[in-house]
UniProtKB/Swiss-Prot annotation:
PROSITE patterns: CTLH, LISH, WD_REPEATS_1, WD_REPEATS_2, WD_REPEATS_REGION. Residues 1113-1129 have a biased composition (Low complexity). The gene is TPR1. It comes from the Eukaryota. Residues 4-36 form the LisH domain. It comes from Oryza sativa subsp. japonica. Probable downstream regulator of strigolactones signaling. SUPFAM superfamilies: Quinoprotein alcohol dehydrogenase-like, WD40 repeat-like. InterPro entries: CTLH_C, LisH, Quinoprotein_ADH-like_sf, Topless_fam, Topless_Znf, TPL_SMU1_LisH-like, TPR1-like_2nd, WD40/YVTN_repeat-like_dom_sf. One of its GO terms (cellular component) is plasma membrane. This is Protein TPR1. The keyword Transmembrane helix does not apply.
């Protein structure tokens, strides 16, 4: 807004105040954000009108704008919370805690827990820090003093706290002056003009010769809806804002708006675009180059003329050949195994059979699909950790970080990679099969959700977006050119594009907002709601004239639409999706050849003609697709890559695509090497991209001494699933040839990192249950003596993240009161009892039992909040309902399951289905089921809405083994796969059908009975402990052993040689670190174990041998392993 328009707002504020429009004046203050009325703010705080206080503040700042703003909102919401507690309105206090204060837990989790603990006190003044809290009135006054200091110090309120000095009734004076001027221009001015309206200019026709007399109009008569004002600037008249921005309207003065952009990025246009000639705009992975010069037609259209142009005209579209449904790529040409779950794919912009693939293990791979050959693989590696932010360094211990997006630059010379934590990588691609490291940028705090290339002013740039709600633009030296703020949720996707000479970016966020940005510092130009109001991606047609978006709502409903750019409205909505998409994630889509739309849903690929909302065709691609497959067309539209459930992808082709692939025949890549090299115009010693410094700087570190080693090719795929049976192979002459796989064996303490928890006076003889806190900062162990012990890691220079780590020994934590979390034992020997424990999601409460009543402990004070369910029968397993911490499933000694409501202290229902005691319970939030396991080797499935039994499955025992002993169950991270653990086996079940997919039986070096096992944080590994002290680490896919940890690696010689020998009784996986786990031992000690920092992970993924690895049985082929459908990009 121009300075004169800003001043006009102040004039209106003065007028509203003088005319006593009290509510309106404060509404305008808030909406404009130009003047913060401290007096009004104080009145509302003193009155305790908290909703109005926050609403008024929202016009000037948001919670996460800066630390001052955060403190302001926190103090207000804390006061609101304390007042509810002081009124003993617990329901209101809980509501404030969950809705208003929860946002601060991400910034200070300990403080949020402490605030939560106030609910447990009869009078919150019992808290030492709040002991001096007086009455409500004095508390508000004290808080207001603090708020005023924060507001005055907050840079966002600078120059907004003082109203400008104005003469009284300044707006009335200006209007009177304008009317006098108009009256002077009257051809026949009347001596006493009658002013009846301000909506039109004044004119009068009095008798001949009358002189104009001054006009004075009382402004009280001025209607609140003002008319047209005289020009406020030398260039454009001030006009009321339109009802809502259109996708075209905000571009009307784009050329003028870009004049403030540095010339290195966007050159300002010297030709302003008339408002009625706004170019409509609203993701194409490849950004086409801009015209080298404006076309003659465009110059004519932009040149000022004597008559207006009603609408924008476009060059005639390029004639497209007729096409039919037979042109859809639906034939399976080949199936290729990537080796880990595929997260992103992109075909080369000019070499249409080169496919770039990104995976969950952080590896990028380039495939020549015509030869079914892997040209190179680059495993995840941080190039220069010292150049990264301390925040990333604290989380960079993971061996790999998943890839969110891979993409080619428009000319195919650069590869962009966006990772799920902080980083982007740029690689220079040198044909045929070499790459060079160009840039590593710590781009965003949290995940980098999307990456794309753009060319403002014909200069290649990289655009990124992330969880930190920002969109950033980088040049090829790693310098940040722009950082766009405005989204209120993590930014999910970006779509850079251009129309004529106007360059812009569309972005979408997880709250379903669509915003548009020019390359300037003026903020977003539009703000729309995407259909579904959740994850949405946007794409332009190949010719750049039509805009589409596809997204999914949180409820699983999917939307594919075409936009009317000029109006900002939806032009057509395509039908054919299921009401609720199968699987957890987001529907993916792509477009090709200006004719075809394709989306992956319901284990198939669906196609639409862009001009018809009815689904045209669909294909299951011979089966094996996930619920929501990812997909990508090549630029010719004759090949389509789609992901499969077994860590691979399929290439679908039409007749033209099949001819292209057959041209390769069975010839190896070497036969085509000369063709690739002849087409490359780059000299190997020259920079691939102009403007990239050949010297290695902070952002463009190059590791020339570490050639990337590709992952071994998986040969376990089912050959029958390939239409063209040609096995993948790697050139014999490659310098980075894959090494033979070897099982990682950790045999001594020098091969891993181990931290032993400090001993305590109440240490038990055994650790029978073990849990990490959900925040990852503590370990909770239940001993055979019925006492729970808690260890916490402190945040310090040695451990900046404050999370559990084997690098630092934590402290045994106890409250100042010295209380101990001692369970009721009901006069029984706790050594003979079946222990059970469960932790609430916010780490505030722990529930446990050890033969006696179930006790609910406060984790901060260790006080017993309540006890319930006295024996007999005794409780044997506990599980919180995932959606309601007040609902608990309790497994019992008598084989029943009690569904207990803590709030009303009542058993809602009893479930009967087992023959012996309950040993395991697991909820699936996605499938809405509870799975129970018992000492009878049975699995039962219960519907959580009706609590009816849906199914009962007997665990298949190895030959000669009796169906007895404890069985544990655990869901993976997306609740679709169930890990079943028994001393005789590890097994993975498809939870929706309760059918066993894989089974592993103890053998060879791991032949002892299994004592316990657990999924890793990301559910990609299984940590299993054995009664001889060995620990096995398995890949979830096929339950293949990738690492064995021998007892000497983590146990002392005394422990190994003791009688009986020491071994792990329980295993717990860290909730955030995928390769960290803890074990509770039979001697009462607890240890945290991690791989060496130089290794970063527990071995590598083993190859499949002859389809089924030794010792692992499967109920399906090696290619029928349905991977978890994670939230897809």
């Amino acid at each position: 807004m121009s300075s004169l328009s800003r001043e006009l707002v102040f004039l209106i504020l003065q007028f509203l105040d003088e005319e006593k429009f009290k509510e309106t004046v404060h509404k305008l203050e808030q909406e404009s954000g130009f003047f913060f009325n401290m007096k009004y703010f104080e009145e509302k705080v003193h009155a305790g009108e908290w909703d109005e206080v926050e609403k008024y503040l929202s016009g000037f700042t948001k919670v996460d704008d800066n630390r001052y703003s955060m403190k302001i909102f926190f103090e207000i919401r804390k006061q609101k919370y304390l007042e509810a507690l002081d009124r003993h309105d617990r329901a209101k206090a809980v509501d404030i805690l969950v809705k208003d204060l929860k946002v601060f837990s991400t910034f200070n989790e300990e403080l949020y827990k402490e605030i939560t603990q106030l609910l447990t006190l009869e009078n919150f003044r019992e808290n030492e820090q709040l002991s001096k809290y007086g009455d409500t009135k004095s508390a508000r006054s004290i808080m207001l003093i603090e708020l005023k200091k924060l507001i005055e110090a907050n840079p966002l309120f600078r120059e907004k706290l003082v109203f400008p000095t104005l003469k009284a009734s300044r707006l009335r004076t200006l209007i009177n002056q304008s009317l006098n001027w108009q009256h002077q221009l009257c051809k026949n001015p009347r001596p006493n003009p009658d002013i009846k309206t301000l909506f039109t200019d004044h004119t009068c026709t009095p008798p001949n010769g009358a002189r104009a007399s001054p006009v004075s109009v009382p402004l009280a008569a001025v209607p609140k809806a003002g008319g047209t004002y005289p020009p406020l600037t030398a260039h454009t008249p001030f006009q009321p804002p339109p009802a809502g921005p259109s996708l075209a309207g905000w571009m009307a003065n784009a050329a003028a708006a870009t004049s403030s952009v540095p010339s290195a990025v966007v050159a300002a246009s010297s030709l302003p675009v008339p408002p009625n000639q706004a170019v409509p705009i609203m993701k194409r992975p490849t950004i086409t180059d801009y015209q080298s010069a404006e076309s003659e037609q465009l110059m004519k259209r932009l040149r000022p003329s004597g008559h207006g142009v009603d609408e924008a005209t476009y060059p005639a579209p390029i004639p497209q050949p007729l096409w039919s449904v037979e042109d859809l790529p639906r034939t399976v040409a080949c199936t290729l195994s990537q080796g880990s779950s595929v997260t992103s794919m992109d075909f080369h912009p000019t070499r249409h059979t080169l496919l770039l693939v990104g995976s969950t293990n952080g590896e990028i791979t380039l495939w020549e699909v015509g030869m079914r050959e892997r040209l190179f693989s680059k495993p995840f590696k941080i190039w220069d950790i010292q150049a990264c932010s301390p925040q990333f360094q604290s989380v960079a211990k993971e061996s790999s970080i998943s890839i969110n997006r891979v993409t080619w630059s428009p000319d195919g010379d650069l590869i962009g990679v966006a990772f799920a934590k902080h980083l982007i990588h740029l690689h220079a691609y040198q044909q045929p099969n070499e790459t060079r490291q160009v840039l590593e940028i710590d781009a965003h705090s949290g995940a980098v959700n999307d990456i794309a290339f753009s060319r403002p002013n014909k200069q290649l740039c990289v655009v990124t977006c992330g969880d930190d709600r920002l969109i950033k633009v980088w040049d090829m030296h790693g310098q940040k050119l722009f950082s766009f703020e405005g989204h209120e949720a993590p930014v999910y996707s970006i779509c850079p594009h251009h129309k004529e000479s106007i360059q812009f970016i569309f972005s979408t966020s997880l709250d379903g907002k669509i915003k548009a940005w020019l390359y300037d510092h003026m903020g977003s130009r539009v703000d729309y709601d995407a259909p579904g109001k959740w994850c949405t991606t946007m794409l332009y047609s190949a010719d750049g004239t039509r805009l589409f978006s596809c997204g999914t709502s949180k409820d699983g409903d999917s939307y594919l639409v075409e936009w009317n750019e000029s109006e900002g409205s939806i032009k057509r909505t395509y039908s054919g999706f299921r009401k609720k998409s199968a699987g957890v994630g987001v529907v993916q889509f792509d477009t090709a050849q200006n004719h075809i739309l394709a989306a992956g849903e319901d284990n198939q690929i669906k196609f639409w003609d862009v001009d018809n909302t009815t689904m045209l065709s669909s294909t299951e691609a011979d089966g094996g697709l996930p619920g929501l497959p990812r997909l990508r067309f090549n630029k010719e539209g004759n090949l389509l890559a789609v992901t499969t459930v077994d860590n691979g992808f399929k290439i679908l082709a039409n007749a033209d695509g099949l001819r292209t692939l057959r041209a390769f025949g069975n010839r190896p890549f070497e036969a085509f090497r000369s063709q690739y090299e002849a087409s490359s115009m780059k000299v190997s010693g020259a920079p691939v991209v102009a403007g990239i410094s050949p010297n290695i700087g902070r952002m463009d570190h190059i590791d020339r001494n570490s050639p990337a080693k590709p992952s071994p090719i998986m040969n376990g795929g089912d050959p029958a699933s390939r239409s063209i049976d040609i096995k993948p192979r790697i050139s014999e002459e490659r310098p980075d040839k894959a090494k033979p796989w070897e099982l990682m064996e950790v045999l001594n303490a020098q091969q891993c990192r181990v931290a032993t928890m400090p001993e305590t006076p109440d240490q038990a003889s055994k650790v029978v249950r073990l849990l990490y806190t959900n925040s990852g900062v503590g370990l909770l162990a239940l001993g055979s003596n019925a006492i729970q012990r808690l260890w916490k890691w402190a945040r310090n220079d040695q451990n900046p993240s404050g999370k559990a780590t084997a690098n630092v020994v934590p402290q045994h934590w106890q409250p100042n009161s010295g209380l101990v979390m001692q369970n009721d034992t009901a006069d029984t020997n706790p050594e003979d009892a079946v222990p059970c424990i469960a932790l609430s999601k916010n780490d505030s409460y722990v529930m446990s039992a050890c033969g006696g009543k179930v006790s609910l402990f406060n984790m901060m004070t260790f006080k017993v909040m309540t006890t319930f369910m006295p024996p007999p029968p005794a409780s044997t397993f506990l599980a919180f309902h995932p959606q309601d911490n007040n609902i608990i499933a309790i497994g019992m000694e008598d084989s029943t399951i009690h569904i207990y409501n803590v709030r009303v202290d009542e058993v809602k229902t009893r479930l009967k289905g087992h023959q012996r005691r309950i040993t395991g319970l697991a909820f699936s939030n996605n499938l809405q089921i509870l799975v129970s396991s018992g000492a009878d080797a049975q699995l039962c499935v219960w519907a959580t809405d009706t609590w009816e039994k849906k199914k009962s499955v007997a665990i298949q025992m190895p030959a000669g083994k009796t169906p007895s002993g404890d069985t544990w169950v655990q869901f993976n991270s997306d609740w679709s796969r169930l890990l079943v653990v028994h001393e005789t086996q590890l097994a993975i079940y498809d939870a929706s059908k309760m059918e066993r997919i894989y089974q592993w039986i103890p053998q060879d070096a791991l032949s002892a009975p299994i004592s316990h096992a657990s999924y890793s944080r990301n559910s990609q590994l299984v940590f299993a402990a054995f009664t001889d002290g060995n620990i096995g680490i398995f890949d979830v896919e096929n339950l293949r052993l990738r690492c064995r940890i021998a007892p000497p690696a983590y146990l002392s010689s005394a422990a190994i040689n003791s009688n009986p020998s020491v071994y792990p009784l329980v295993v717990a996986a860290h909730p955030q670190e995928s390769n960290q786990f803890a074990v509770g031992l039979s001697d009462g000690s607890v240890k945290v174990i991690e791989p060496l920092e130089s290794e970063g992970k527990w071995g590598t993924t083993p190859p499949t041998e002859n389809g089924v690895p030794n010792g692992r049985t499967s109920t399906s082929s090696a290619t029928s392993n349905p991977a978890a459908d994670q939230i897809q990009r």
